[in-house]
UniProtKB/Swiss-Prot annotation:
SUPFAM superfamilies: PLP-dependent transferases. It comes from the Bacteria. This is Glycine dehydrogenase (decarboxylating). It catalyses: N(6)-[(R)-lipoyl]-L-lysyl-[glycine-cleavage complex H protein] + glycine + H(+) = N(6)-[(R)-S(8)-aminomethyldihydrolipoyl]-L-lysyl-[glycine-cleavage complex H protein] + CO2. One of its GO terms (cellular component) is cytosol. GO terms for biological process: glycine decarboxylation via glycine cleavage system. The glycine cleavage system catalyzes the degradation of glycine. The P protein binds the alpha-amino group of glycine through its pyridoxal phosphate cofactor; CO(2) is released and the remaining methylamine moiety is then transferred to the lipoamide cofactor of the H protein.
């Protein structure tokens, strides 16, 4: 009997699309040399050996041919022109603002800032760490609370994180009710309801000015200050009453208002949350924007997200790094305080620079100007006989319309291309902002048949709530108010950071590929970045068309039937996908299904997300080859049987291989009634070659900031849409704009998440076309195998798949070097900085290893440079092993070597300055200098300082 051979990949990998050769770094002349090293005659032959035959896609992706950059931009411009940019005074936490041109051009549109990765390697990230420390100082000063994080995803998510922190802090009491003021932003309340349900928390809306509140069994209270509808009232008595009963109090607030109003910390709040969007970040139809989270010192170890702290380096210099990392999900896993990793660093940097540029006086002047125009608007309305709901306010009015019918007001507003907020009781809301002019005030009054009136008195702020305490006194907020000064400050910080403009960033599981300029240009178009997220949908027809087209493209690429673009980070995609699974089981009367199987190799966000979704995490073992232990999986699936909710699996695996048993694994889970959740972090190895929806996954999140070219921004923004099979489609997260009948609530504040960066992924797919995307995947796999092959004589490759090949990344085992030379993986990571490279992923998923992902965008010359650096470092280690170099005083243990270190006299090390700083010939042409020597992380955690307590840059 003849055994049929597995089907061979017949997909076309050749394309004439102009952009593909720009995106892919490997040239036609490079290809034969690289394949020859691997022992293959063609790219197809290599891919057939890597991809398991049972999952290979046997047809081309049904996507259009790739367009030229000019044609793609013209096509996108046609969509953008379908959006209508009206004057929006809707408020609800979203405001028009002015992005200073010096910040727009030199940060938001600058690849030196937006192509950086999360600052794990702090010695080559001092610039963005300083900008984030400025952000933390800004938030801490304005909120009056001791400690603030380096950004969260949006205001509603920050409020949900505050709820969770409060719940965990009061867990011993057994309380499960969270009181929420009914004048909070409605989108915040919606996200809170979503997050509360799986945790068994009951959301109780309350009237903050009512007499007695339902305190019984409550653990926390959320207040909005100023209120969503504009009221400014003191929360102090309510906070004190809550504290008497053991509740923690969160205040959602507005940073600009806090330049004039007493800060929440002074009023007794335990936590303050909000958005920094109006500090120079465009509306963007809802995002991305940097939220903030500030709290008392007591809760520093429960703080969600990332935290920048001050320490010192080996030379005694002040240096910055990420603090208290042991509390984060990648270490704490299911015990983590939050699942958030990527947040909104780029937007936090923009907001911090806005504050640096304007300084405390400039910010106060902006706030006073907005308030005075709101006062004049109020006076005109009152003179015309309209009743204001509140006599004290900052920038927002709620107006009783009297005899003016709402339809008439809407008609007048539409004729003037103005958006207002309309309440269910027939009143209207107007929120003014930095861009509002006197003419705008007159136009608004005209809608009501009113005219500007004389203003008696000064402001309309409560006397007891006027801010007296100083803020932003640090020199960084005083010294850079001219454009030249700020430009040089921005450039000085940028020069301290290694980005993709410097060299390859070979971080495994991070996919640091090209973020092409043509893909990035549209984020600055006003048709995309000046729409309010709650503007009527007919004003956003271009966006809606883009959403439909992008969702259809992603559905074709993944094999799923429906896509939600709402999740604004990979972590939120995971959470949303698990909520979909939970809701599906509940709809079938199987609410007991709450067990989530997760391999021990999984990224820490997986178990953290599962716990947030109300699931019990059960670990599944991996075998010696790094694959899921199928026998252990089957046994646990059987054990939990009708309690099995889901399996979370990454594919290719976090160990960098295509597991051949993936179909069997999915079948086992389905046999016991569970659903398969696939983490799409490694989708860059699948596009065009296989589709998760075809081989058994029921739901999958994608990282558009990895596979689909949204830049990492130094730690955000990210986008994590989810794809689902048809049976799960009814349970996708709903939005407030288009109710879908789903019982799964929204997971983000804005209906479409980080809408304004979705054009980046649309552009990437449109430029590449189906064949171009498939070729990119094949080249990414080729590059990873090329590096593995070149480095294997020097460092063992820990895991391999069929035919001795890896997927799109490889893991080098450095553990033997600790015994032979006393060298840790950190030493190699720091020494790579001296060679001009960012380290690969350190000690994950296996401690003592490096995981390398080169992507398809790097040239062969850059791959070779990286390999030569790694080989040279191995030679340095060999000298230690041979006793030629000292085990402590050697170039690795002392790395990195900043310029200041080289100026040391007398030179104290047993190797030359040249070996320290110029260990490779290419460094003589261009040398990237680490800003500081090796940082003492432990000191920084023991002596936690997370604000600008003294000058950082002179």
């Amino acid at each position: 009997m003849m055994v049929s051979s597995p089907p061979q990949l017949e997909i076309n990998l050749e394309t004439d699309a102009e952009f593909v050769a720009r995106h892919i770094g490997i040239t036609p002349s490079d290809l034969p040399k690289m394949l020859s090293l691997l022992g293959y005659g063609s790219l197809k032959e290599l891919i057939n050996a890597v991809i398991p035959p049972e999952i290979r896609l046997q047809r081309p992706l049904a996507l259009s041919e790739g367009l030229s950059e000019t044609a793609a931009l013209q096509k996108l411009r046609t969509l953008a022109q379908q959006n209508q940019v009206w004057r929006s005074y809707i408020g609800m936490g979203y405001y028009n603002c002015i992005t200073p041109s010096v910040i727009q051009r030199n940060i938001l549109e600058n690849p030196g800032w937006y192509t950086q990765y999360t600052p794990y390697q702090a010695e080559i990230a001092q610039g963005r760490l300083e900008a984030l420390l400025n952000f933390q100082t800004l938030v801490s000063d304005l909120t009056g609370l001791a400690i603030a994080n380096a950004s969260l995803l949006d205001e509603a998510t920050a409020a949900a994180e505050a709820m969770t922190l409060s719940f965990n802090a009061c867990r011993q009491r057994g309380a499960n009710r969270f009181l929420v003021a009914q004048d909070c932003h409605p989108q915040t309340l919606a996200v809170l309801r979503t997050r509360a349900l799986p945790l068994g928390i009951q959301i109780v809306p309350i009237d903050p000015i009512a007499g007695e509140l339902p305190w019984e069994n409550a653990f926390g209270l959320l207040l909005q200050y100023p209120a969503s509808d504009g009221a400014v009232r003191s929360p102090q008595a309510l906070i004190a009453a809550a504290h008497e009963r053991g509740l923690l109090v969160t205040v959602a607030t507005d940073l600009l208002a806090l330049t004039l109003l007493r800060p929440p910390g002074e009023l007794g709040a335990d936590i303050a949350v909000g958005s920094s969007q109006r500090f120079g970040v465009p509306l963007g139809y809802g995002g991305p924007h940097a939220a903030f989270f500030a709290t008392r010192e007591d809760f520093k170890r429960q703080l969600p997200g990332r935290l920048v702290g001050v320490s010192h380096d080996a030379l005694g210099q002040r240096a910055l790094r990420l603090a208290l990392q042991t509390r984060e999900q990648h270490i704490r896993r299911e015990k983590a305080t939050s699942n958030i990793c990527t947040a909104q660093v780029l937007l936090a940097v923009v907001a911090s620079m806005y504050a640096v540029y304007h300084g405390p006086d400039g910010l106060r002047q902006i706030a006073e100007r907005i308030h005075q125009r709101t006062v004049r608007l109020a006076a005109g309305l009152e003179a015309a006989g309209y009743q204001l709901y509140y006599s004290e306010f900052f920038d927002t009015l709620r107006i009783g319309l009297g005899n003016l019918p709402v339809p008439v007001l809407k008609e007048r507003a539409a004729a003037a291309r103005i958006n207002l907020r309309y309440f269910d009781d027939g009143s209207a809301g107007i929120s003014l902002d930095e861009t509002t002019t006197e003419k705008d005030v007159a136009d608004l009054l005209a809608l009501f048949g009113a005219r500007p009136a004389e203003v008696e008195g000064g402001d309309r702020l409560p006397a007891a709530l006027k801010r007296q305490s100083p803020y932003l006194q640090h020199p960084v907020f005083q010294d850079y108010h001219s454009e030249h000064a700020l430009l040089r400050y921005i450039h000085r910080l940028q020069a301290k950071d290694l980005s993709l403009t410097t060299s390859m960033i070979p971080l495994g599981s991070c996919t640091m590929k090209l973020n092409a300029t043509a893909e990035m240009l549209p984020i600055s178009w006003p048709e995309f970045n000046q729409l309010h997220p709650f503007a009527p949908q007919e004003q956003a027809q271009g966006y809606q068309a883009l959403f439909r087209e992008l969702a259809a493209m992603l559905a074709e690429i993944t094999g799923f039937d429906a896509i939600s673009l709402q999740p604004n980070a990979g972590s939120q995609g995971e959470y949303a996908g698990l909520l979909v699974i939970r809701q599906y089981h509940h709809s079938r009367g199987e609410s007991q299904r709450n067990v989530c199987l997760i391999p021990t190799s999984a990224h820490g966000t997986n178990p953290a997300s599962a716990v947030m979704a109300g699931m019990q995490v059960v670990a599944v073992n991996c075998d010696a080859q790094g694959n899921i232990d199928v026998a252990d999986l089957a046994a646990k699936a059987e054990t939990y049987g009708d309690r099995l909710a889901a399996l979370m699996i990454t594919y290719p695996s976090t160990h960098g291989v295509f597991e051949t048993g993936i179909c069997q694994i999915c079948d086992i889970i389905h046999r016991y009634g569970g659903q398969v959740y696939m983490d799409g972090a490694n989708m860059n190895a699948q596009v065009g070659l296989c589709r998760p929806g075809d081989f058994g996954a029921d739901v999958c999140h994608l990282n558009l900031h990895k596979t689909f070219c949204i830049p990492h921004g130094g730690g955000g923004p990210g986008v994590g849409p989810i794809g689902v099979k048809a049976h799960l489609a009814p349970f996708l997260p709903t939005t407030q704009v288009i109710p879908q009948g789903s019982e799964t609530g929204p997971v983000t504040a804005a209906p479409w998440g980080s809408a304004s960066i979705l054009p980046i992924s649309w552009m990437y797919i449109t430029l590449m076309g189906g064949v171009g995307l498939t070729r990119a995947t094949a080249i990414a796999i080729l590059n990873a195998n090329y590096i593995a092959k070149r480095l294997e004589p020097y460092y063992p490759v820990l895991y391999k798949g069929a035919h001795g090949l890896v997927a799109h990344e490889c893991i080098l085992d450095l553990r033997p070097l600790k015994k032979s030379a006393g060298i840790e993986v950190e030493d190699i990571a720091k020494r790579l900085m001296d060679y001009g490279f960012h380290a690969p992923t350190v000690s994950w998923p296996v401690p003592g290893t490096l995981m390398i992902e080169p992507t398809e965008s790097e040239t062969k010359a850059e791959l070779d440079r990286f390999c030569e650096a790694m080989i040279a470092i191995r030679s340095e280690i060999a000298e230690i092993e041979a006793g030629v170099s000292d085990r402590q005083q050697n170039p690795l243990k002392n790395a990195p070597h900043p310029a200041l270190m080289l100026a040391t006299e007398p030179w104290p090390y047993p190797y030359s300055r040249e070996v320290a700083a110029y260990p490779a010939p290419w460094l003589r042409e261009y040398k990237f200098w680490p800003a500081v020597a090796r940082i003492d992380n432990a000191y920084g955690d023991r002596h936690l300082v997370c604000t600008c307590s003294m000058p950082l840059t002179n």
